[in-house]
């Protein structure tokens, strides 16, 4: 697709930052969350109705990522760990 390289790089960065968050103390978790927020800011929205080749993330997936970030910011790693197991 048009954004295949970007999507792959974002996926790798996402797994790295979430793993770093999961393995860290409070200071490392804060650093990891800041890094992951930068990755999230780069995630393009897939235009509704566009062909798959256009690339990007669905609005639903981006909302779930935002919810995972908020959960992690509260110190709850449940969804982070589920994401790591399922995707990384």
Question: How would you describe each model-predicted region?
Answer:
Residues 12-88:
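Extracytosolic low-complexity repeat regions of secreted or lipid-anchored proteins
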Residues 1-7:
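N-terminal low-complexity, intrinsically disordered segments
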């Amino acid at each position: 697709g048009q954004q295949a390289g970007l999507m792959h790089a974002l996926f790798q960065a996402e797994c790295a930052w979430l793993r770093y968050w999961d393995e860290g103390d409070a200071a490392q978790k804060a650093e990891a969350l800041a890094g992951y927020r930068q990755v999230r800011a780069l995630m393009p929205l897939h235009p509704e109705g566009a062909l798959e080749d256009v690339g990007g993330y669905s609005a639903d997936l981006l909302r779930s990522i935002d919810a995972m970030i908020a959960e992690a910011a509260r110190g709850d790693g449940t969804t982070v760990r589920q994401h790591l197991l399922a995707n990384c």
